[in-house]
């Protein structure tokens, strides 16, 4: 069976891993890095992904960052006259990770397990699946990020019964989950979080501080200067990382702006204490969901066996200290927080292919599901934190006499009134026979599969007439749209490859022009002038084709010139050999004459053995 890769599709960084020899391994990208920034940029009709896109994020307006925040919405971004959905942008990142995996494994990859925040609703999960399909991947399973972390951690802990808190503070989202591990079974008991909180926010408080300090000193607002803002963002991220290891760091940005008299420089010492003061509110915001998850699980902090940290932002000392204070447990640091989710996804891939045995993953639905009933009330059929896959049915009736149809309004959320929750979809069950209010029996069934995707059906028990819906919210893509996007993604991949080949062809042609000039110069006066003229003419024809940018013409003229240059090079080589032979003969004769006139004998002493 072909390998199933595990992908952590993150808000700020993504990571891909695979099972090798029974162990999950992170696959490095072409630059040799183990994580890839989730950034896509468009420049001169070329797509850039990762570090190269991130480096010019602020200066290039056609750069898309943190697109994961928009998954499951109808958000679109227009780039160079074309509209892109969050699924398409995510697919570009997934294509990049897929290509890294294929280069590493030396085989085509078509299947993946992709992780999502535990708090992702149905629309967001469906959008993630669609992104995988557009990228040419069969998404075998969508799993929650904290669950994936527990899977990676739990490989060597399958025989221990434990209650684990997974504290996942990534670049753009925060999740906390409580899991139970026993006999190779991972069960998520509860989950909570904030999908608008992450490492980006910690960077931003440093940027705001730098902007405020510079404005105080120079009365210039750097936040209005895109070039300066890019440098501030890079410096803030570096300072944040530095302060995880040292107690103070120097931020030095020369020529950050122009003053009336001369250029202005930003020089500032940032201490860990100041950073903790600036970010105290952000750290505090992670604790409320932590308390809520514990409460939902019916546990006190003292009942936890282990606290696992996930996400690069958990390296911040204040974050580690806060979770230690809150739980009374020293956070476990035996897993790389940047990679553990991808490793867990790879383990789940191994479970699905049969490479990993004895592991059962029981995930939960993060939000309650139900329908709108009389008076706009939200009636829950499946409570949040219910283990999935699951199915639940409930019988309802009509609200008016002789009601011919019922509208089924499917919702997700925790508020008591329908208007305050998120609509997942609507459908209608018609042709209900006339009957007094309350008599018809309408059975509504909710099914949630292992990916957290919802199917709802309504059945009139009197007539057995049935109507069903697979939830496709406003952001969901139809099969036709996904197919179109898959074709576009493939076409773009082909276009990117073609563009690369074009660049290589032009480079080869330029190199040949340079080589021809050199050969012609070396052969001047040594070969027939007609041959030199022929080479010069072919070279000029190639230069003209390069200027016109006619690729087929470049290829033809390049091949023609290549042949002429090869013939000339052979002649040059033959002449060099002949010249070397003559020189050798002359040198030999000279050496022989010199031998007679000036013979130098080595001194030696003959030693005779005594007989």
From Swiss-Prot:
Induction: By stress conditions e.g. heat shock.
Region (Disordered) location: 579-598
Keywords from the UniProt entry: ATP-binding, Chaperone, Nucleotide-binding, Phosphoprotein, Stress response
PTM-bearing positions, type Phosphothreonine: 173
Keyword Nucleotide-binding recorded: yes
This protein's record includes keyword Amino-acid biosynthesis: no
Family annotation (InterPro entries): ATPase_NBD, Chaperone_DnaK, Heat_shock_70_CS, HSP70_C_sf, HSP70_peptide-bd_sf, Hsp_70_fam
Low complexity: compositionally biased ranges: 579-592
UniProt record similarity statement: Belongs to the heat shock protein 70 family.
NCBIfam families on file: PRK00290.1, prok_dnaK
Protein name per the record: Chaperone protein DnaK
Organism in which the protein naturally occurs: Bacillus cereus (strain ATCC 10987 / NRS 248)
Gene name in the database record: dnaK
